[in-house]
Amino acid sequence: MDNKKRLAYAIIQFLHDQLRHGGLSSDAQESLEVAIQCLETAFGVTVEDSDLALPQTLPEIFEAAATGKEMPQDLRSPARTPPSEEDSAEAERLKTEGNEQMKVENFEAAVHFYGKAIELNPANAVYFCNRAAAYSKLGNYAGAVQDCERAICIDPAYSKAYGRMGLALSSLNKHVEAVAYYKKALELDPDNETYKSNLKIAELKLREAPSPTGGVGSFDIAGLLNNPGFMSMASNLMNNPQIQQLMSGMISGGNNPLGTPGTSPSQNDLASLIQAGQQFAQQMQQQNPELIEQLRSQIRSRTPSASNDDQQE
């Protein structure tokens, strides 16, 4: 494989990591994004080309060179020296213990056991992916991203690593990148309903643009008021004689022009208001279903689901 492409990929991967965790100013981040685009165009690679990844990251390679350490063999060849049978068995035992700690929500202990398993067998993508899940439960999304990256480097066809990467990136409000990883997860596991759902949510987040006049949840009040269908129906509602009588009675302090014998004014007011609201909602649903769906989307609290990703391997 072309080592120039490997080097370009390593640099792009490093720059992406700096964007996420480097604590850079907005100007510096913009400069890095431009640099990434230039490198991707010049060498024909992207951060998704995980088959170009080396076992060590660029900072690890640089550190080894700066300290005079011998270049690890696995940087010259993807082949790794497999762990002994004893180490493999102990690593599996530690992983299982980590899984048990996840079940009882002892996430810090789970991180510890997965880390010990990684020390014995650093070529196992599952161990990194499981630790990423534990990091996410602790709110350490940056750590989860790094472990998912390592898992993907080890096994580029590991769908769960892409799915968990998407979750971590979503939690960091990196929805553009989250969408890319969810799509890759679905490409590898097309029947996974959780990936499908999370992809839709991430794409929705991308489409949601805050409005300068928005209220709670960045709802676009200006857009609603500029919607001719909405304004026409609202005008018809307010010109309804029954509604005008109702509002007049409520404003006058409880005088109930719609009242009937034996029924309190408040009951009539409430019933009339509910009826009018139902009629208005039905008209909106029939004439502008897209607007109704927008309203529902704003009201719902929608966050990515980790349902099947909670299951450790």
UniProtKB/Swiss-Prot annotation:
It is found in: Cytoplasm; Nucleus. Residues 66-100, 250-269 are annotated as: Disordered. SMART domains: TPR. GO terms for molecular function: BAT3 complex binding; identical protein binding; molecular adaptor activity. One of its GO terms (biological process) is positive regulation of ERAD pathway. Residues 90-100 have a biased composition (Basic and acidic residues). The modification Phosphothreonine is found at residues 81, 303. The keyword Coiled coil does not apply. TPR repeats lie at residues 91-124, 125-158, 159-192. The keyword S-adenosyl-L-methionine does not apply. Ubiquitous. SUPFAM superfamilies: TPR-like (SSF48452). The modification N6-acetyllysine is found at residue 137. Changing residue 38 to A: Reduces tail-anchored proteins transfer. One of its GO terms (cellular component) is TRC complex. The modification Phosphoserine is found at residues 77, 84, 301, 305. Keywords: Acetylation, Chaperone, Cytoplasm, Host-virus interaction, Nucleus, Phosphoprotein, Repeat, TPR repeat. The second tetratricopeptide repeat (TPR 2) mediates the interaction with SARS-CoV accessory protein 7a. PANTHER family: LD24721P (PTHR45831), SMALL GLUTAMINE-RICH TETRATRICOPEPTIDE REPEAT-CONTAINING PROTEIN ALPHA (PTHR45831:SF3). Co-chaperone that binds misfolded and hydrophobic patches-containing client proteins in the cytosol. Mediates their targeting to the endoplasmic reticulum but also regulates their sorting to the proteasome when targeting fails. Functions in tail-anchored/type II transmembrane proteins membrane insertion constituting with ASNA1 and the BAG6 complex a targeting module. Functions upstream of the BAG6 complex and ASNA1, binding more rapidly the transmembrane domain of newly synthesized proteins. (Microbial infection) In case of infection by polyomavirus, involved in the virus endoplasmic reticulum membrane penetration and infection via interaction with DNAJB12, DNAJB14 and HSPA8/Hsc70. Belongs to the SGT family. Homodimer. Homooligomer. Interacts with DNAJC5 and DNAJC5B. Interacts (via TPR repeats) with HSP90AA1. Interacts (via Gln-rich region) with SLC2A1. Interacts with HSP90AB1. Interacts (via TPR repeats) with HSPA8/Hsc70; the interaction is direct. Interacts with BAG6 (via ubiquitin-like domain); interaction prevents interaction between BAG6 and RNF126. Forms a multiprotein complex, at least composed of DNAJB12, DNAJB14, HSPA8/Hsc70 and SGTA; interaction with DNAJB14 and HSPA8/Hsc70 is direct. (Microbial infection) Interacts with Vpu and Gag from HIV-1. This is Small glutamine-rich tetratricopeptide repeat-containing protein alpha.
